[in-house]
Amino acid sequence: MPSRRAARESAPELGALGSSDLSSLSLTVSRTTDELEIIDEYIKENGFGLDGTQLSEMPRLVPRGPASLSSVTLGPAAPPPPATPSWSCTLGRLVSPGPCPRPYLVITEQPKQRGMRFRYECEGRSAGSILGESSTEASKTLPAIELRDCGGLREVEVTACLVWKDWPHRVHPHSLVGKDCTDGVCRVRLRPHVSPRHSFNNLGIQCVRKKEIEAAIERKIQLGIDPYNAGSLKNHQEVDMNVVRICFQASYRDQQGHLHRMDPILSEPVYDKKSTNTSELRICRINKESGPCTGGEELYLLCDKVQKEDISVVFSTASWEGRADFSQADVHRQIAIVFKTPPYEDLEISEPVTVNVFLQRLTDGVCSEPLPFTYLPRDHDSYGVDKKRKRGLPDVLGELSSSDPHGIESKRRKKKPVFLDHFLPGHSSGLFLPPSALQPADSDFFPASISLPGLEPPGGPDLLDDGFAYDPSAPTLFTMLDLLPPAPPLASAVVGSGGAGATVVESSGPEPLSLDSFAAPGPGDVGTASLVGSNMFPNQYREAAFGGGLLSPGPEAT
């Protein structure tokens, strides 16, 4: 328990009170409980300079009656917290700042890697302009840089030159040509406080010939163009003439006039368009856009120039990739490839699946823009047997539901071909043919009369003989013209009564030959005209002629 000694030690702490307060406090020992409560309220009001949290931690006086007042003790008061000096903020402003950030250079727009053609000086034309990486057909962008933390600098000079693609990034023999370019280097001056950004417009690449490589490199090194201090190389055959990098480096002078250089930065590689080893890949056309999922479909692909030993045709989806089957002999003049499609990963697909087909260079992995290709489900009837069977089966339901279920009317409507249609194309149209059309053009090659074996007439006098006498009972000759209907008399033969010869009298004029002028044979007519339009073969005409009594058999041929 706290002793009276502790109460006496705490008494000096109460010296902070006034003299009147000390006298009133000394009387509290012999006073009643009401007076102790008054003292407690007084302490709460004044607080001795302490806040409410500290008062809650101090022991509170409890009224115990007059007999126990002698044992009341007061605990030690906690020291007040140190007050914050009013000049602390002023000292914070007087603290010396740290080292200022060092200015540096960044590339905000990379040059486009592919699509730029390097041109020789002897071509006598502009080398073009390097576009930005985000350039499209609709909007063109340019390579751009930006200076950072250069607010206190008045002027900064930025230098751009060409270096190797790989380490140690030596100076490249090719040169930059265009606006603000001299000696193969582009130099621009920027004022960071005005505009810290700059875009390189009309910046092209001019290539040199192999025999000029060494001289071009030495000339640049003498001008101090070597951002990485890599020096020159004796064996210049290692220089890759088809790819370069653009190195940007900034320099400035401080207030004392000392020259400072920022760290050089490199762009992405820029490839020559005309080189097949580094050019951009592009598919122009494919002859087919779909094929079976089993693969093996032969396709023809047209593209830009590629290397036949460094190209592959890839079919892919998000979870599958297959390569086409072809050899170097299937690459035609670097612009066409004949290949066979690979089988799809799932041969039992029930619906068509669309995949991407693109070109890929094996050395650097560069790919072309993909084109769609559709895999079709497997055809279980590859030889078309089922289709042929279905094609041969009659449409029973269709025939029974029609007005002519047995096809009788359709057969009746079919016109039977006429025999003369094969010889006289104008029969149906009623055209007239002149008599000369039925006469052979060459009488030597096409004889007027044709004798068939076994149908030769008996020998008789020739018509041209002087002693020929007309005999009506003699049998007539059988010719191919007898197969045609009888023609109207073109000429009349009149036999003179007084002479022995026959006199042929021609008609007054040629009469047109028409099929309408022929009289159809009646039921009682029997002759060769009745055979026209029949379906008999030529050897059957003989039997028909002999059986009808039209012809009499002649002597057998020996």
UniProtKB/Swiss-Prot annotation:
Disulfide bonds: none
Every RHD domain range: 103-418
Keyword Nucleus belongs to the record: yes
Basic and acidic residues bias: start-end ranges: 1-11
UniProt tissue specificity: Expressed in intestine, thymus and spleen. Undetectable in liver, bome marrow, kidney and testis.
Record's comment on post-translational modification: Phosphorylation at 'Thr-103' and 'Ser-573' is followed by proteasomal degradation.
Motif, Nuclear localization signal: chain positions: 387-391, 411-416
Residues the record lists as Phosphothreonine modifications: 84
Post-translational modification Phosphoserine, affected residues: 19, 552
UniProt GO BP: antigen processing and presentation; cellular response to osmotic stress; circadian regulation of gene expression; myeloid dendritic cell differentiation; negative regulation of DNA-templated transcription; negative regulation of interferon-beta production; non-canonical NF-kappaB signal transduction; T-helper 1 cell differentiation
Name of the protein this chain belongs to: Transcription factor RelB
Species the sequence originates in: Mus musculus (Mouse)
Gene that this sequence comes from: Relb
